[in-house]
Amino acid sequence: MANVSMRDMLEAGVHFGHQTRYWNPKMAPYIFGQRNKIHIINLEKTLPLYQEAMNYVGRLAAEGGKVLFVGTKRSARKAVREEASRCGMPYVDHRWLGGMLTNFRTVKGSIRRLKDLEAQAEDGTFDKLTKREALSLSREMEKLNRTLSGIKDMNGLPDAMFVIDVGFEHIAVQEARKLGIPVVAVVDTNNSPREVDYVIPGNDDAIRAIQLYLSGAADAVLEAKTATARPGGDDDFVEVDEATEQQG
């Protein structure tokens, strides 16, 4: 599950942190050293923590749990949308609306509105309206879709949240903490791991690194679902042995 080696992480640039002057001292245990005023993350720490996080995501998926993928900065959006969709998990890739979790009842109202508009567009209702009315409703639908398309099939709060860049997504992390929703997150050298349940110390800017984290999480979900769908169920779900992985 989530079969990633240290070489894969090196090639993706997972070990490159931020400039040393922007560091967060709480990340000191995960830093190997510095090179050209850039902190270098210790992949011997990252790899087992990454595997632990992926095993957790897999266990949740095996039990039918929902993991909300969150990454709204430009370098993360595409991978968040594609990998969450690939494994059938909800996602937020555009903008985190304040209250998306803590005020989920209101958000559900917006989701209902979006689904109503989509149904009207589909059944020809828009064609019976004036051009101005149809344009107004189309714009409303597009706006709602940008923000809510990834969570429109999420009927309740997620069981966990997988975050790329806890600094950029601090509001999402705060809401999850407030509701007791476990947070799995990539934490770079400029952020604090304090609010995160499953810390993955790593580069949160490089597209290749972001793709590695997200494809690993999607694979963990899909493999867990496949294992539990087979006769024998949960017994077939195999967690990754970090020691074996480090040999890669």
UniProtKB/Swiss-Prot annotation:
<dbReference type="InterPro" id="IPR001865">
    <property type="entry name" value="Ribosomal_uS2"/>
</dbReference>
<dbReference type="Pfam" id="PF00318">
    <property type="entry name" value="Ribosomal_S2"/>
</dbReference>
<keyword id="KW-0689">Ribosomal protein</keyword>
<dbReference type="GO" id="GO:0006412">
    <property type="term" value="P:translation"/>
</dbReference>
<dbReference type="GO" id="GO:0022627">
    <property type="term" value="C:cytosolic small ribosomal subunit"/>
</dbReference>
<keyword id="KW-0687">Ribonucleoprotein</keyword>
<dbReference type="InterPro" id="IPR005706">
    <property type="entry name" value="Ribosomal_uS2_bac/mit/plastid"/>
</dbReference>
<protein>
    <recommendedName>
        <fullName>Small ribosomal subunit protein uS2</fullName>
    </recommendedName>
</protein>
<dbReference type="GO" id="GO:0003735">
    <property type="term" value="F:structural constituent of ribosome"/>
</dbReference>
<comment type="similarity">
    <text>Belongs to the universal ribosomal protein uS2 family.</text>
</comment>
<dbReference type="InterPro" id="IPR018130">
    <property type="entry name" value="Ribosomal_uS2_CS"/>
</dbReference>
<dbReference type="InterPro" id="IPR023591">
    <property type="entry name" value="Ribosomal_uS2_flav_dom_sf"/>
</dbReference>
